[in-house]
A protein has these predicted regions:
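Charge-dense, low-complexity intrinsically disordered segments
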Residues: 3-4, 74, 118-121
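Short, surface-exposed linear patches
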Residues: 51, 65-69, 90-95
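Oligomerization/assembly interface segments of phage tail-like spikes and tubes
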Residues: 62-80, 87, 123-136
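Small/polar-rich, solvent-exposed N-terminal microdomains that initiate assembly or binding
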Residues: 1-58, 78, 82, 98
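Short, solvent-exposed beta-strand/turn "edge" segments of beta-rich domains on protein surfaces
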Residues: 57-61, 119-122
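Generic helix-packing signal
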Residues: 14, 84, 88-91
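Acidic-leaning, charged glycine-interspersed low-complexity segments
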Residues: 89-140
Length: 140
C-alpha cells in the first residue's frame, strides 16, 4: 500500500496538452532562455489542493481524485479563450497515466473569466479553469 504520487498525473496532463500542439509550462509560464517575456500563447499546469484518495480494504489509497488548474495565456483576450478551448478539447480526448486507468477528466470550472495581467511586459491575458482527474490502478 502506498499513496499514488502526483508526478505521473501531472506529467500525463502536460504531455496530453503538448500532444495537442500547445506550448505548456509546468507551474510557471514558459519563457525563452535568458529572456523575461512569456511565450504566448501558452498553457500553464498547476496541481492544486483538494481532491481525495480512496480504495479497498487491501489498498485504501489506490483511487485518486486529483485537482489541477489550467491557465491559458494569450496576447489578447480572444487568444486566451481560444487556447483555453484547445486545452479543454485536448483533455476531453483523454489523458493516459502510466500504470493507471483514467476514468474521467472533468472540468470543475470550465469557463474561467479572462483577465489582463499588467505585471508582465508586454501585458498578457489569461483565463483559469479548474479540473479533476479520477484514476485507479490498471487491472493486472
Amino acid at each position: 500500500m502506498a499513496l499514488v504520487g502526483a508526478y505521473a498525473h501531472a506529467q500525463a496532463i502536460i504531455e496530453t496538452l503538448k500532444g495537442a500542439g500547445l506550448v505548456v509550462g509546468d507551474g510557471e509560464a514558459p519563457r525563452p532562455a535568458g529572456r523575461s517575456e512569456i511565450i504566448t500563447p501558452c498553457v500553464v499546469v498547476h496541481m492544486i489542493d483538494g481532491g481525495m484518495v480512496d480504495g479497498t480494504l487491501a489498498d485504501p489509497d489506490e483511487w485518486v481524485d486529483a485537482r489541477f488548474q489550467i491557465t491559458a495565456v494569450g496576447r489578447v483576450a480572444a487568444e486566451a479563450r481560444d487556447i483555453a478551448d484547445k486545452a479543454s478539447a485536448a483533455l476531453a480526448g483523454g489523458v493516459t497515466v502510466a500504470g493507471r486507468r483514467v476514468m474521467r477528466v472533468q472540468p470543475i470550472d470550465p469557463w474561467g473569466r479572462v483577465e489582463r495581467d499588467n505585471d508582465v511586459t508586454p501585458p498578457v491575458y489569461y483565463s483559469t479553469q479548474l479540473w479533476r482527474l479520477f484514476s485507479f490502478p490498471e487491472a493486472p
